[in-house]
Amino acid sequence: MGGFGGALKNISIGIASTHGNTNIHTAGVTTEAAELFNNLPPQDHFLESMADACKAVISYKGAENMLYINVANRLSVDCDCDSHPAEPEMSDLGIFASVDPVAVDQACYDAVVNSPDPGKKALIERMDSRHGIHTVEAAAQHGLGNREYEIISLDE
């Protein structure tokens, strides 16, 4: 698991075919799903592979043609691919949108960390134990966006 499921995870893992997903999860070792669990790479290699896939998608579609929307509700420690995910422990944080996938994911990560919600503890532990922010770091290094952002609230 990537440790953090936002825009970057969804434009890499979410768009990829079964063979593409296997290629991402194994950091390029294989595209054969039957070989996936025998070829799991170090965690950071997997996260960097997600950033590589993001770069490919954005390059193909054109950054000017993309908008990223993260709906931060019912936040669970488990991936949405888990057939039996843990119940959410954290309240909703809102909807985040940007033309910058790095900024929107960094903003969501920071919103979790800075939330007063006591339910954040388990989510932060999961993100940190999986080095979830590394996909954001790698995507920024690829030039896919900026980790600095400004929150503009539409509620106020």
Model-derived regions: residue spans:
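Extended, low-polarity segments enriched in aliphatic/aromatic residues
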Residues: 1-156
